[in-house]
Amino acid sequence: PFPLPKEERAGLLMHPAWLIAWSGNFDNDPIRRGKWILEHLLAGTVPDIPITVDAVVPEDPHKTLRERLEPTEAKACWQCHQKMTPRGLPSENFDDFGRFRKREVLGENLSIFSDRHRDAKSVPVVTAGAILNSGDPTLDGEVMDAFELVHKLAGSTRVRQSFVRHAFRYWLGRNETFDDSPTLMAADRAYTENGGSMKALIAS
């Protein structure tokens, strides 16, 4: 267990359980974190990785994870990665165990016992990211850290409607159809009018 000061957390996207679930085995994974935000909060999709593409992030003990992700900015890759990676990078303030950090350790895999890499070389974490091509022009733009990302998402109508849609799919065990539009609209209205009440959403 480790402390969770309020000034270091805000919402689901900064909860250790979510951060761990969308990390790799040995490192953070901004791509997977950003893909989750795209699909679950912004109602977006990306195609499957082409079978001809080597999708492994290169290992280099002298580079940060952000630097090792630079190959995904190539034109052929960026058309999809722009929807994911910039949204996941703000969570670099947290390691793959969900712990808050200000520096990234280089040259070795992080240990759950932080004192084991106390003397290892480290660099300040860069948390800048962006929301690009979200489908909501009021949402698109640069974000400086996970807090700004979370607050922008929390105020988005698109995110709210996507949340309601995913709740519908979860509770009914199927995707929505065109005939479900009145139900979804009623659910969104009930959720909004009752201050984001899950009880009201379920009852609707």
Features from the language model and the residues they span:
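Active-site substrate-binding loop specific to GH73 endo-beta-N-acetylglucosaminidase modules
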Residues: 1-158, 164-171, 180-199, 203-204
